[in-house]
Amino acid sequence: MCGIVGYIGKRDVAPLLLEGLQRLEYRGYDSAGIVVTSPKTAGLKMVKAKGRVRDLEAKVPARFKGTTGIAHTRWATHGAPSDVNAHPHMSADLKVAVVHNGIIDNASDLRKKLEADGVEFLSETDTEVLVHLVARSQADKLEDKVREALRVVEGTYGIAVMHADFNDRIVVARNGSPVVLGIGEKEMFVASDIAALVAHTRQIVTLDDGEMATLKADDFRTYTTEGTRTTAEPTTVEWEAASYDMGGHDTYMHKEIHEQADAVDRVLRGRIDDRFSTVHLGGLNLDAREARQIRRVKILGCGTSYHAGMIGAQMIEELARIPADAEPASEFRYRNAVVDPDTLYIAVSQSGETYDVLAAVQELKRKGARVLGIVNVVGSAIAREADGGMYVHAGPEVCVVSTKCFTNMTVAFALLALHLGRTRDLSVRDGKRIIEGLRKLPGQIAEILSREEEIKKLAEEFAEARSMLFIGRVRGYPVAREASLKLKEVSYIHAEAYPASELKHGPLALIEPALPTVAIVPNDDLLEKNRAALEEIKARSGRILAVAHQDQEKADQTIIVPKNEDELDPILMGIPLQLLAYYTAKALGRDIDKPRNLAKSVTVE
């Protein structure tokens, strides 16, 4: 949720760190800070600021020089946003500096013990506990000081530590919060996200939980928190720095909405097998015999990924005839769920680092379950923990609000459902039908986006609403849920989603002219049922915007979406509602790429 970036080498470090923080702004934050040193400098120099990275940059003095440093963007969990609570945190003797992502669960107990020993705390944060533990250690090496501190803390962390007496190194560690190393020419980088690294290096090493690393300018080594050396194999990142630029768009959200046709083309590329009307998904590590033995599918995700999973569950039931359902990972991991060896579990996450999803995967693995991962970021924690899976190949998604990753996740589920179906009873004819539908998607997405001006005008009207209702039935219901989430995320307009079949069971009491209803009305076997719901709303003077394949007489306005196969329609029907949310937020002057109180990757509980 926060962002870490660090560097050790020969270059002037402050501009590098500030640039790295700017590339991590999309993760969400409320304050920022930086600390630097060099072999020729006595001690550590630090600057912190509440607000944006530009506020921090304005406070950094011209003579703030160094060749080693760490920096951080903070998203408050312990203590309000302020200069004092911003990271890095420094020891009383100004020798130890720490940046930290995660939550120290036993921070309160440790703080009391340290205060009883005379330690004075300056901030309200849990991170400051780590600083004092490292500073008070009597170990000779910085690595051992950090190891001793980590031995007594409980919780999650991704940390980077500097010490004035060891200014030739940065020590980092990971447990439940991502840490990525970047390997350069006689220089090393560290970050919580590869977005901060790709402008400088494509060679990365991702630390595992329970792993530490020492970074020097011309070398690095990795080891467990117990001190055992580990082998680090660098991987090459395919994403380019240009992928993180806006490319002429006003916001990343707008850019990423318009990248969806190309993104869908990428997730399909090389996977379709026309000869057998199926798809190649070698990364599943699941052969035909094992696929036929699956008796149930359980999909776990959070937020938008959960909604993609809801759509995926319906696709799997329809095409593979396997009972399937989706559940928020944040709920699943806290109940004593029955783990069935004949159930295939699928974890969905854009970042591959979502804490609740990762924790659910780890618990399932502990109980012997087979788990697949559907993620966007190559080499992420879920990708490494899972038995197999699929990359959705959406490319970097910078806006906090997910658009193209959601779409590519739903396409990935369509591919998986087709694959499972063809190992069972799905006919060649139906396999071919779905493949033809998948191939139409990029062109149909482009067609939807060509109606942007029409949707923009509608959004300017809806910006006046205080609340909105979204409805859909069966395939349309997850689309309604995701559209509702998008609107509230970026516009801050209250929105709720209900199955259209549930209108009589409560939501009808809300219907009035001031409450717009957005209805998902696909031209499928439930068309007349959906039209009946529109009749009920209209009879109570409700205003209706329909998203449909043909004009709806009872709706005040209709956004026409091109028709695909029934099973694939949900992939398309949410895209105009992404634009609706975007332009509603724009009309209200919202910070679209960085909505208040939200973060891109939720890596804490």
Residue ranges and their predicted role:
Residues 1-246, 250-251, 259, 265-296, ...:
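Conserved short alpha-helical segments that host acidic/polar catalytic motifs at enzyme active sites
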